[in-house]
């Protein structure tokens, strides 16, 4: 199921009201979803895929649209985390890696072992 499909279902069920800006964002998230799924099934070297930075006024549904994207993304190695929590964990890792050569690269490699897609809120 694509993000726009879930969005349409939520509207049909009366859980959401249609918003053209949200729909426009979800169209972009559909494309990202498709590219990520295609990449995950590729036998060839995986190319990086440019993500999306979602911004807007408070109360416009940014978090909800990201949640819809995350829920519909059919990947096992995905993570959704609040930005401040992520930074706290990263700094804890960097403290533990203190004294090692290139601790930031080691921390990033550790994160990427378990994560193909990272959604920040």
Indicate residue ranges for each PLM-predicted region:
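Post-Walker A helix-loop "phosphate-sensing" segment adjacent to the P-loop in P-loop NTPases
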Residues: 70-79
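Conserved lysine of the Walker
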Residues: 62
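Hydrophobic positions on the alpha1 helix immediately C-terminal to the Walker A/P-loop
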Residues: 65, 69, 82
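Short glycine-rich substrate-engagement loop in P-loop NTPases that contacts/grips substrate
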Residues: 78-115
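N-terminal pre-Walker A segment at the start of P-loop NTPase domains
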Residues: 15-43
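Pre-Walker A (Motif I) flank of P-loop NTPase domains
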Residues: 45-54, 116
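Walker A (P-loop) phosphate-binding loop of P-loop NTPases
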Residues: 59
């Amino acid at each position: 199921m694509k993000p726009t499909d879930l969005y349409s279902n939520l509207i049909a069920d009366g859980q959401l009201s249609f918003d053209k800006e949200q729909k426009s964002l979800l169209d972009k998230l559909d494309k990202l979803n498709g590219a990520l799924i295609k990449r995950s099934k590729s036998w060839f070297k995986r190319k990086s895929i440019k993500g999306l930075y979602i911004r807007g006024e408070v109360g416009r549904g940014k978090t909800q649209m990201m949640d819809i994207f995350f829920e519909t993304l059919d990947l096992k190695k995905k993570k959704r985390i609040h930005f401040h929590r992520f930074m706290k964990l990263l700094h804890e890792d960097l403290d533990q890696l203190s004294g090692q050569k290139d601790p930031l690269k080691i921390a990033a490699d550790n994160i990427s072992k378990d994560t193909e897609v990272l959604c920040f809120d």
